Amino acid sequence: MKNTELSQKKKLDRQSRRKPAKSCHFCRVRKLKCDRVRPFCGSCSSRNRKQCEYKENTSAMEDQLRKKYRRCSKLEMARRIEELESQLTKQSQPNIHEGQNPLSNMRYLSSKHNRHILYGPTSYRAILATQTDTFAKYREEIWQVLKLSRNNWKREHHYSTLSEISSIETAPPHSGSPSVIEYLCESLPNYEVLCEYLTDFFASDFYDSYQIVHKEKVLRDLQDCFVKGPRSHKTGQHTIISLNLDSKKNYYKVGVMTAIMCLASHPKEVPEAIEVFHKVLTSFVSAKVFYTERVQFLFLRYLYINVAGLDGGDQSHCIFIHGLTIDTAIHMGLNEDLRRLYLSKNHPIEEIPYLERLWLWILFTDVKISLSTGIPVRINDDFVNKVRLENYSSSGDILLYKTTLRLRNIMKQIHAREKPPDIPLIIEDLKKFTIKMFKPLDFYLNASNLNGNEFTELQLWHATLHMIGSLSNLYTLTHQDFDARIFNFSVLAPLNSLHLCFNVLETYFELDNSKLSSKSLCLSKKWPHLNNALFLIYVNAFRALIQIYTIFLQYMENKDIQLFIQRNSSALTYSICPGDFEGPHNKCISLKIAFKEMENIFDHIHQEKLKPLTQIWQNSYYFSIIISMEKIGRRAFNKGMKNIDEGPETENDATENSLTTILNDLEGPLEDFSENFIDDILGSPSAFFDTAISGWSNFEDFFSR
């Protein structure tokens, strides 16, 4: 008897405690310290995990709840849950500190059928949403009655707020032509080909760089939105015969996929039907289009404009599409705390990191367009919560985040009305920032270090070099007290941008070309790395050329600059080292050497070993423009460059009289340069264009080999 009692006692002793596990499953298994933040702890969030599960022993609590609420109906329980959720939402609002405006955080997100519109304190929707729960309950009951009357009126008068979107499904009257949707379905590739384009895109370094759309969601939309026809006996593939959307007609899901297809298939020509479809989607303006897919679609369109080299050279063709992207994103609250704002509306948690990253890229694009066009940034500081961005950006986005904020701050100083910017100090701070945050330029100029994963870093480096070059030019134009270091920055920053462009172009071409020699046929028509290099060339090469030519023109026209350069020229010949954008200390770099270095950059691309790559130059419109601009500049400035004196052989020779004599000797040739400029560059167009521009067809043929 005693043995039985002892055995039962041991069993009771071995029972585990009902103490809940506080750490999430991931941290508990890997023995990591869990901060227990929900819905994602710090460890899971930093690793971009899609799940963060907490296993809790709640059996005792469940028993108590069952006893307490066993007589409650489901309706009463649902109402109680809504009240408690509302209280939790209000409690989660950030505490209002003394002196802080309580209205600044008064936000209401109206969500309906996956459409989201954000309202602020002066909106009646936000005011009503802050009322008591009892008032909200009665408001819903009143709205249901009003909604019945409204729907009856709509049916009687044949009115629909979806008429704008529905127009895409209707053929123009008396035209005999198909509707936009019918035309689109006729022009789309087979379903399997479209699926392959999407798969290629999500496997590319380009997608890894941006990650603004959720891969699994897009692939689900692919299955849900397209209706496949019968399988072709010839190809074994299915044609797309129609689209399958819900009653709210979110065509932006399809737009995201067709925009991705355009990016993945570049440089193949985009069918006219897809271009028309994209233009129509872009033109919608009613409140029925506030889908997150609309913001993604507009930004993907912006990316394609840059990938195809259609930005106008200075982002001027991107201004309106960028404005639409900003307006839609802000009115949907993408600049807010999405993890609090959207989770209360049952928005999928796995999509929120992509929306946060999308807003971060929109901020960077705003700076990029502002820098290129010379206009202040469009996104006001009120929409940029710096602390929130720093908390929620993943480790891969930190460089993008910090570079964007640094460049935004510089643009703010440039356009300030009250205080002129201290340009030398700004340039020095930006140089220190690049040293701290970036790998050195030498790293990216070494082909062995490039594998395609550095695409984001290259974009940020180019933007930083553009800013340094622009500020240096501005200082030279607006200040009489010239500075040798500033002058060197203005020459070497765009030169290094050109070095970076063409080194990446050559290296990425070799990366793709090495795959072509393999037996894999699917890679024989794909140039993913080269397309990324073209993106950098289109956006940065033309701009760098113009910056360098601006320096040459300043020298030709401004005698003060001529005198300053002659007085501060280095006694020893200074050879330009790619990767160095500072130059000799307290001495001006020779313009002759800079001009020769630029010639070497462009001559290198025409070497025999790069002959396959030069075919791109011969058949691309944008490349032809760049080549022609360089040839025109080479011929126009070559005469002036020959007459530039290298400066005094010793510092003792740099007297005022000798400098005046040098400038007088230069005056004649420079006047000849100005008077005979047109004669110098006139000639047969073939002297500048390697071939007649024949559109993109030949360019496409080259890539399809």
From Swiss-Prot:
Phosphoprotein is among the record's keywords: no
This protein's source sits in the domain of life called: Eukaryota
Q: Which SMART domains match?
A: Fungal_trans, GAL4
Q: Which GO terms describe its cellular component?
A: mitotic spindle; nucleus
Keywords, in A-Z order: DNA-binding, Metal-binding, Nucleus, Transcription, Transcription regulation, Zinc
Predominant place of localization: nucleus
| Feature: DNA-binding region | 24-52
Listed GO MF terms: DNA-binding transcription factor activity, RNA polymerase II-specific; sequence-specific DNA binding; zinc ion binding
The cellular location(s) given in this protein's UniProt record come to: Nucleus
What is this protein called in UniProt?
Uncharacterized transcriptional regulatory protein YKL222C
Q: Which residues form the signal peptide?
A: none
Instruction: Give an example GO biological process.
Output: DNA-templated transcription
